[in-house]
Amino acid sequence: MKTQFFSPIRTAFLTAVLVITCSGCFLIPPKHSDYRAIHEYATDGNVAGLTQDLAAYPGDVNLTDDAGRTPLHLAATHCHVDAAKVLLDKGAKIDAKAVGGTTPLDVAAQAGCVDMVNLLLAKGAKVNARDDQGRTPLDRATQWKRDEVVQILRAHGGIE
């Protein structure tokens, strides 16, 4: 199931539908979230959507959701290398930390995204960045038995 997000237009439309179908009801507006269209585009690997969104809202490149994840975290989690390239070209912070201190390299290593790990390392991601529990990307790759990622991280000086 896809994660819901509310754009201002969609929110206005849903409110209008509720008003029409529920005359006299007490309306509670939808809970606003920090999850925006750019996060959905990154999650889906929608390069066209990312490009269009960033052309209109360049500051959104490092916009965080409720969990502190940037669009780059989400692209890395889902192995969307082309989306990550767009985000990095537009100034995404390669070592941004989400809640818990995880970086895009952490989530790519945990997911076993070999091409993403290679891209992030080539672009300068810190191979030994530690999360709030002291874990490194190599710790995550080892825990999740991502053997190819383990080899790549070790070749780049990764430590546990």
Where in this protein do the model-derived segments appear?
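Bacterial N-terminal signal peptides that target proteins for export
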Residues: 2-13
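Leucine-rich solenoid repeat scaffolds
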Residues: 128-160
